[in-house]
A protein has these predicted regions:
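Active-site neighborhood of divalent metal-dependent phosphoester bond hydrolases
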Residues: 45-120, 126-127, 131-156
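Active-site-proximal beta-strand elements of phosphoester/diester hydrolases
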Residues: 2-10, 118-124, 190-192
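N-terminal active-site segment of His-dependent metallophosphoesterases
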Residues: 1-50, 55
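Residue-level marker for buried hydrophobic side chains located in beta-strands
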Residues: 5, 34, 59-60, 119, ...
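Divalent metal-coordination and catalytic microenvironments
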Residues: 8, 37, 52, 62-63, ...
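Acidic, His/Gly-rich catalytic cores of divalent-metal-dependent hydrolytic chemistry
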Residues: 139-218
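Active-site environment of divalent metal-dependent phosphoester hydrolases
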Residues: 10-14, 40-43, 66-70, 127-128, ...
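A general structural motif
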Residues: 27-29, 56, 116, 164-165
Length: 218
């Protein structure tokens, strides 16, 4: 069995399929986890949903997933979402056939997955207060430290993070790119959002092999 953890997919179903093939992933044998932000912004959110189901993927909640969930709540309550941007309208339209199913599923997606070997979150944790005292918004949006709302520049939260988990894996920070931090030769922190939806690459990590793999955006 291998455990494959993949960065933000953002509706890039072809690249997700490419990466699964590159890893020789078998749903009957292996385990797939995603850093969140699976559907929004990209060309084929429904294709991503089918791959998630076909491969039994687990996921942590991202900021785009939280927003999508709110919009699906609006549709359920009033018949239409509020405050949507063009890319969000595209995503909602592409997922129209599974709105109810997806909404239920998103409410079951956790903010983090913590196990003996790793902690998986979308954006990060509060480096001063730790996992137990990280707020909802920090789990899904934290980037800089100290936090500056909307900013993509400046020191990152993980620049001041002292490792207390064997391996902390996150996504969210496409501007920051691939992040690999080691101590005593072993990785203790990995940032896997390498901006596939922006024309760069989709990146995954094979946990047992301690090996990064990636596929170019197409």
């Amino acid at each position: 069995m291998q455990t494959l953890i993949i960065g933000d997919v953002h509706g890039c179903a072809r690249e997700l399929s490419d990466l699964l093939n590159k890893a020789h992933f078998s749903p009957s044998r292996d385990r797939l986890l995603l850093t969140g932000d699976a559907f929004s912004r990209g060309p084929d959110p429904l294709g991503v949903w089918h791959l998630i189901n076909a491969h039994g993927a687990e996921m942590v909640l991202g900021n785009h997933d939280a927003r999508l969930r709110e919009q699906l709540d609006d549709i359920s309550d009033t018949g239409s979402p509020s405050r949507t941007k063009p890319d969000q309208r595209f995503t909602l339209h592409a997922l129209e056939s599974i709105h109810s199913t997806l909404r239920t599923w998103l409410y079951r997606v956790p903010l983090y997955i913590e196990e003996d070997r790793f902690l998986l979150v979308h954006a990060g944790i509060n480096p001063e207060h730790g996992l137990a005292n990280t707020r909802f918004e920090e789990f899904i949006t934290i980037r800089t430290w100290p936090p500056v709302k909307g900013s993509i520049d400046g020191p990152r939260w993980h620049d001041v993070y002292e490792p207390v988990h064997p391996l902390l894996i996150f996504g969210h920070d496409a501007p920051g790119g691939l992040v690999t931090k080691r101590r005593d030769g072993k990785p203790y922190l990995l940032g896997l959002d390498t901006g596939c939806v922006y024309g760069r690459a989709l990146t995954g990590y094979l946990l047992e092999e301690e090996r990064l793999i990636s596929t170019a955006s197409r």
